[in-house]
Amino acid sequence: MTPASAFHFASLVWDWPIAIYLFLIGISAGLVTLAILLRRFHPEAGGSDSTLLRTTLVLGPGAIIFGLLILVFHLTRPWTFWKLMFHYSFTSVMSMGVMLFQLYMVVLVLWLAKIFEKEVIALQQRWLPRLEIVQKVLALITPFHRALETLMLVLAVLLGAYTGFLLSALKSYPFLNNPILPALFLFSGISSGAAVALIAMALRHRSNPHSTEARFVHRMETPVVWLEIFLLAAFFIGLALGDDGKMRALAAALGGGFWSWWFWLGVVGLGLIIPLLLKLWANRSVTFHGVLAVCGASLTGVLLLRFFILYAGQLTVA
């Protein structure tokens, strides 16, 4: 299989824009999850001045919006997407996802608005002084903010897992029809969120890339990476022990060829082994270059994993 044919083959239905969409959704869910955990375990570090919270403020909703725009314009008839926003089907994974996105965005906006309440009120008084309902809504949220935050955490976890459910629902592809995918996508999304957050912290505090906030994310990142490795192993073991279709799918993905090299060199080599090796140097480094190297490799590995799962998963049809 040549590089050209690896991205264009007869059984391919979902191509590269979907991989980027899945990647962006994972970043949003990962950032929100880490931000809430930071506020729970280190309340003093989870205020509006937190780099993690500020990054979440921009990329939490931003990645979702950009990802959905990619998805909409990738549709054959993008102008019909609005129908999915109002016509729900509890038997459709896509429709359930739209419902989840809508609820996620509403709760996310309210949660972030309360955290950045002073900034929101200052902007409202400057640009929309007559829109007093903003302050009233923020005041109403106050007694329920912790419950809202708990709901936000649940929705972030569901969204991170949903990207895996979306692919695992494709029953005609043995590689993708795997119950491990939701958990794998959830933890790899948290890993990508951690990488983005650490890059933001390193760029903002170049003289001290190992702040309390950064150390918390590092502590969360390490077990997440090992869980990701375990889930990858479980994913392939499940294929190896499966029926004829799953064994054919495994052989097509890892039995040599373009996508096999993509996985071993890109996902495993660049995305897992190199960050683990570089982390030893980064932990001793007093500059931000070590953090950028580790997180850049890890983030690239997560993106390559999305491409591998999507394309290699469509090589074999049941």
Where are these regions (language model features)?
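Interfacial loop-to-transmembrane junctions
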Residues: 279-301
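N-terminal signal-anchor module of multipass membrane proteins
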Residues: 1-43, 307, 311-315
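Aromatic-anchored segments of alpha-helical transmembrane domains
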Residues: 160, 298-305
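Alpha-helical transmembrane segments and their helix-start/interface "positive-inside/aromatic belt" motifs
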Residues: 15, 47-61, 95-100, 142-150, ...
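Membrane helical hairpin/interfacial module
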Residues: 27-107
